[in-house]
Amino acid sequence: MDVFSRTFLPAAAEAGVPIATVSRHMPVFRRCVDPDDPAVLVTRCLRPDQPLSGEFMLLLTYRRLVVTQETRVLHRLRLHLNANLRHLSDVSWNPDLRQSAVEVAATAVDGVRERFRMRLGEPERVWHFDELLKHVFRDRRRSVSLAA
């Protein structure tokens, strides 16, 4: 079993994503992510600027951000975003303890500003997801730039 497979299911379980949902999205994610790239965060999310666009699934690894969309009526999957983290700019996130949510925003290489809202249910999980995002986007980038 490769690194991605070993880390994807525990990350999805940690976020409370049902196995049926994970199974539907897994083939799309597998095509986008290298087998040696561990999953850091897997969660459902919505686009706050387009609330009727259906549900999204966000996968964050140490190298990529992949987002799939599932349509409301037919439950069809489509790849919404597949970006190398080095190609994202102006990445930010805003933890909201009052609503137990985290909003993530990033500008993709094509110049489009993407925003996703993760509802987490409990305030403790908000801080945990905040730490995961810090680890990937701040700590790892700092260590990579120091090594170069």
Spans of model-derived segments:
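Anionic N-terminal interaction surfaces
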Residues: 1-59
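Acidic, Ser/Thr- and proline-rich intrinsically disordered linker/docking segments
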Residues: 3, 7, 71-148
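Short, compositionally biased strand/turn segments
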Residues: 53-74
